[in-house]
């Protein structure tokens, strides 16, 4: 694949970076929101069955070992920028607030906004949005995307679904 300048690229453009294939979803003020073209691995949203991405084991993995491996393939730590991720739940509750991350799973809102340029995956994959919160009786259900692109949800401890940062 040839080199491209993301600031000039169209939404939906596929490109290779840091040893992976990515899809450009959004460009805004010199920042690009990208999604891995493929699921990187199958893993629980959270091994402790908590649907709050701010404390989820998947967030720790993506911003730990996974990010470290990506950084080995690029020039320096500024290759990936931090983001303030809005963790508003699917039913609109704001109990989980926001979290600052570098690598993350899309929110339901980001997914919906960019669905037209996101290709379906071969398996189901997690989003960072919770179904609802502990205060509303739902501390374990997290949202995910089916193979046909429709939204679903399941228990955060389920290890059958993919991570697609």
Please report, for each region that a protein language model flagged, where it lies by residue.
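Collagenous Gly-X-Y triple-helix signature in extracellular proteins
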Residues: 1-164
């Amino acid at each position: 694949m040839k080199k491209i300048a993301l600031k000039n690229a169209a939404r939906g453009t596929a490109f290779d970076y840091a040893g992976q294939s990515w899809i450009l979803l959004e460009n805004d003020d010199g920042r690009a929101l990208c999604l891995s073209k493929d699921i990187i691995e199958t893993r629980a949203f959270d091994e402790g069955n908590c649907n709050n991405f701010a404390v989820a084991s998947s967030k720790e993995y993506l911003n730990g070992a996974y990010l470290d491996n990506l950084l080995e393939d690029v020039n320096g730590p500024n290759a990936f920028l931090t983001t303030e991720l809005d963790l508003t739940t699917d039913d609109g509750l704001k109990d989980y607030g926001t979290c600052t991350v570098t690598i993350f799973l899309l929110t339901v809102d980001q997914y919906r906004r960019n669905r037209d340029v996101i290709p379906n995956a071969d398996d189901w994959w997690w989003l960072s949005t919770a179904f609802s919160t502990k205060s509303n009786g739902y501390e374990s259900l997290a949202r995910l995307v089916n193979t046909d692109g429709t939204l679903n949800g399941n228990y955060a401890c389920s290890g059958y679904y993919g991570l697609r940062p």
